[in-house]
């Protein structure tokens, strides 16, 4: 979704990706801890050069999420970072995945409270699914990802546009844990992507 918009520079980090500019393919590891320990040096140096102000989209559903903290540690001092942390559905969280989710969930909040990062946006996949309504099974994940992307993009559009009329006040510096959502004007109903 973000590649459709020229204002975003998309950097992908995952296993099994074809290496190219802004794409980093990591070797498959058996645990989140091994991903954290085995981050290639070139990822950190490259990201320090490339990334100035970014939002990192992270989910804990795979072991590769263990790389998130190591990558963040390498770039956080030189970069204004916000994190969009996507929490898997509760049915998918058990064993090590649940522990990894709890670790990232708490560490990202602590980083935002201490101003090590600009902000953390918490997104619950179940809440996004509820907001999306019925979706064909084969397009389920694509629909959820598109909804998150489109919502985040429109917030960026509004934040970088001059309002004709506003009732909003400036965000206070200590408000660093957030979520996003949708408003249904017909029902006058907010559909938040996480319950804060």
Which residues does each predicted region cover?
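Tubulin/FtsZ superfamily GTPase core signature
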Residues: 1-196
